[in-house]
């Protein structure tokens, strides 16, 4: 559930700024808009042709998504607790070679690969998930080099994100406030 401004920012970042010294990780990729934007940018980045986007989601339709889906092409396509992974795969088919799908519960997920250069977080919907993401992914960030995009930073309904940013203020500074969205990049 992203804006065109966010998608443009992600595409531009992956095409022009991303250096390929660490992974791109998309937490809470939903139906693939952010994953596609990052993959499109990677395709334009000559320094990172072999890189991939690691897309994480539980891919389970939640009752909360019903209101968002109303009036959209996906309205009525999914059942609560059913998988929407096939829809994600259909939408991202064109970029399948540069996307690694991780169908995982982020309260249990643990990054096991190389360093993370870019971490997009659209999954800190509860304090428990936020804590798990901090433990499972943040230790792999490159000091002074990685970017963390917090998709829900501008919203008052996820105050734990602001508390996390405050606690980590000595390690992160604001790089961008993406217009027309709730995303802040550190």
Label each region the model flagged.
Residues 1-9:
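Conserved SAM-binding loop and adjacent beta-strand
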Residues 10-14:
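Pre-Walker A adenine-sensing motif
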Residues 15-186:
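S-adenosylmethionine/decaboxylated-SAM
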């Amino acid at each position: 559930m992203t804006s065109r401004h966010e998608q443009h920012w992600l595409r531009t970042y992956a095409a022009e700024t991303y250096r390929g010294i660490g992974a791109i990780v998309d937490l809470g990729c939903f139906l693939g808009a952010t994953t596609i934007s990052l993959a499109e940018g990677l395709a334009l980045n000559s320094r990172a042709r072999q890189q991939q986007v690691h897309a994480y989601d539980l891919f389970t339709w939640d009752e909360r998504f019903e209101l968002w889906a109303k009036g959209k092409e996906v309205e009525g396509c999914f059942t609560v607790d059913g998988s929407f992974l096939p829809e994600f795969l259909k939408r991202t088919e064109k970029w399948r070679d540069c996307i690694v799908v991780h169908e995982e519960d982020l309260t249990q997920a643990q990054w096991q690969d190389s360093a993370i250069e870019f971490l997009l977080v659209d999954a800190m919907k509860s304090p428990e998930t936020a804590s798990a993401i901090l433990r499972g992914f943040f230790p792999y960030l490159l000091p002074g080099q990685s970017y963390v995009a917090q998709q829900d930073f501008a919203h008052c309904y996820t105050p734990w994100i602001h508390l996390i940013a405050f606690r980590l203020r000595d390690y992160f500074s604001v790089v961008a406030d993406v217009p027309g969205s709730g995303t802040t990049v550190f």
